[in-house]
Amino acid sequence: MQAFDELLTVEQLSFSYEEDEKPVFQDISFELQKGECVLLLGPSGCGKSSLALCLNGLYPEACDGIQSGHVFLFQKPVTDAETSETITQHAGVVFQDPDQQFCMLTVEDEIAFGLENLQIPKEEMTEKINAVLEKLRITHLKEKMISTLSGGQKQKVALACILAMEPELIILDEPTSLLDPFSAREFVHLMKDLQREKGFSLLVIEHQLDEWAPWIERTIVLDKSGKKALDGLTKNLFQHEAETLKKLGIAIPKVCHLQEKLSMPFTLSKEMLFKEPIPAGHVKKKKAPSGESVLEVSSLSFARGQQAIFKDISFSLREGSLTALVGPNGTGKSTLLSVLASLMKPQSGKILLYDQPLQKYKEKELRKRMGFVFQNPEHQFVTDTVYDELLFGQKANAETEKKAQHLLQRFGLAHLADHHPFAISQGQKRRLSVATMLMHDVKVLLLDEPTFGQDARTAAECMEMIQRIKAEGTAVLMITHDMELVSSYADSVLVLHDTGLAFDGSPAQLFSQETGLVQKAKLTLPLLYEWMAFQEEVRDEATVTSH
């Protein structure tokens, strides 16, 4: 590790939302130096996001929480009046849910808001706004209404707001979770370049570690109770503490997982892995789904004003199948799900559920047959407790209560049964939103990023639950940015690109035969397919050289 000067000091920090509750996290102590980059890992619900908000002084004041211990920024307590007034200039947080930090209508005004608070002159402000938009490649969003942006675009805007103020410390809370795979990789490389150029300190909370782990030297790990479990060099932790990390529900970088599976030497570098020959028999073929068609979509189009979001889309969902819906940010994937769920009206086209148009179904009947999990789970919560959320709209009897208890246990939410749905972590909210849909025996299940915000263990449990639902005959359509998940679980893939449906086929066909489309649609190849493509390029180069 390099030698740094002290920037942030955390001493025996604990935090809880209510006086009689056990702490969300407890007894956390560490130092963060100027220019240092650190990964903050831990299972879903262990207090990572709450810790981030304590570090820049938003908590406990913003939530009437209870905090003990100390946080020092430049050796001054962040709770000091003088420090708290200027802290956003020194320590910026990009929230897990970007909507929570926006207060203006347009992108330009949102970035300007923070700069105005720093009393930046107007001419300089305009230069800073244009520079940061160009740096993040979102200049085309400058005059857009924030409410019209996709989740991934909002996340980039939130980062732009922080970068424009040039803080000494940037805290990123799952910054790539809403980005398409190409944009996520691009984002990480951008942060790497920016950090080296500007020299700011960086604290990253993340579940997807493949792009971060090779260059962020230090990692801090929290356990389920919110205590610090590990703190050390990233390479050492993944090499020597992999089993401990897995037990905590932390996703091991895919390169580590693959080399362990293939009994190969340890490395965090996929470039090193790709130099080795691929063992035979590691790409398994799947049978095409053979169930009857449940949902038929024909020539479906949707527009906002004069702007076409998607047009002339046709596909079908079959009983007992899992279809992945993928594509770049802003292509209308979430909008398509809303149209399929009859929450938005299409401009043209037909949607048939069991050969009957959606509009022929009564609302209550449609909801019993079709479940929809929103990208933002808070949009579907209507009760005051986690338990009541599961029972909402159900007949109160022993059978439904038993099913609710089973789902609480299955999704690791039993200890939160009496909590308000808005007071649990983002990962827990996501699990609750999926669980509520499983209270109904739906025939079609629409899922918008079901594993978003989940640690490795709960994401795997969520997918296994979806697999069981699929095995019972339900047709599942799932938006995801995780191509490894697509490769492992999906029976078929739909690729939305350039307002149309660019691909409808198997994952193996997409990743092995349509690599040009993978690149155009801002996807990434699963690691094994990327390895295969790399070795094919090497063979082609060798052939050209030999001639």
From Swiss-Prot:
Keywords: ATP-binding, Cell membrane, Membrane, Nucleotide-binding, Repeat, Translocase, Transport. Its EC number is 7.6.2.-. InterPro entries: AAA+_ATPase, ABC_transporter-like_ATP-bd, ABC_transporter-like_CS, ABC_transpr_CbiO/EcfA_su, ECF_ABC_transporter_ATP-bd, P-loop_NTPase. It is a peripheral membrane protein. The keyword rRNA processing does not apply. ATP 2 binds at residues 327-334. Gene3D superfamilies: P-loop containing nucleotide triphosphate hydrolases. GO terms for cellular component: ATP-binding cassette (ABC) transporter complex. ATP 1 binds at residues 42-49. Residues 8-250, 295-523 form the ABC transporter domain. CDD domains: ABC_cobalt_CbiO_domain1 (cd03225). GO terms for molecular function: ATP binding; ATP hydrolysis activity; ATPase-coupled transmembrane transporter activity. It comes from the Bacteria. The keyword Flavoprotein does not apply. It is found in: Cell membrane. Pfam families: ABC_tran. Belongs to the ABC transporter superfamily. Part of the ABC transporter complex YkoCDEF that could transport hydroxymethylpyrimidine (HMP) and/or thiamine. Could also transport other HMP-containing products. Responsible for energy coupling to the transport system. The complex is composed of two ATP-binding proteins (YkoD), two transmembrane proteins (YkoC and YkoE) and a solute-binding protein (YkoF). This is Putative HMP/thiamine import ATP-binding protein YkoD. It comes from Bacillus subtilis (strain 168).
